[in-house]
Amino acid sequence: MKMIRVVAAVICDSIQTKHRIYATARGYGDYKGQWEFPGGKIEPGEAPQQALKREIEEELDTEIAVHDKIGTIEYDYPTFHLSMDCFWCTVVSGELILKEAEAACWLTKDELDSVQWLPADQTILEKIREMMK
């Protein structure tokens, strides 16, 4: 099975308090309309943190700071295996402008279940919820 390595930014309002996190709804493909943490593929020779900064700049026109790693998701979709490193991130500059996603919102820990998450992203939600205030 083909393996795809990606990174995801769990962008929070404050690295100390983590009251709200930013999620985007996919704007294309089989999972269009489902929610995910923004990010993307790691290019050859690129560190995960570098890939994350590049992807968020491309997708959201925003500069981020990458903080602690939350964990790695290993998930089998029907046609590929996904390995996704998830990191806490904060906005350094920019306005989180949607370039690829169809929608976005800030969610509190009580609102995490209010959107339909992509299957892989669902697997780390509980860990994120426990770390939010």
Regions found by a protein language model. Name each.
Residues 63-65, 72-95, 103-105, 128:
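Active-site-adjacent beta-strand/loop module that shapes the phosphate/pyrophosphate-binding cleft
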Residues 1-21:
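Conserved N-terminal beta-strand and adjoining loop/helix that marks the start
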Residues 129-133:
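Generic C-terminal helix-cap and adjacent flexible tail
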Residues 11-12, 23, 89-91, 106:
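Conserved hydrophobic "DFG−1" position in protein kinase catalytic cores
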Residues 30-34:
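A conserved beta-turn-beta hairpin within the catalytic core of GNAT-like acetyltransferases
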Residues 88, 97-128:
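NUDIX/MutT-family hydrolases
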Residues 37-69, 108:
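The catalytic Nudix box helix
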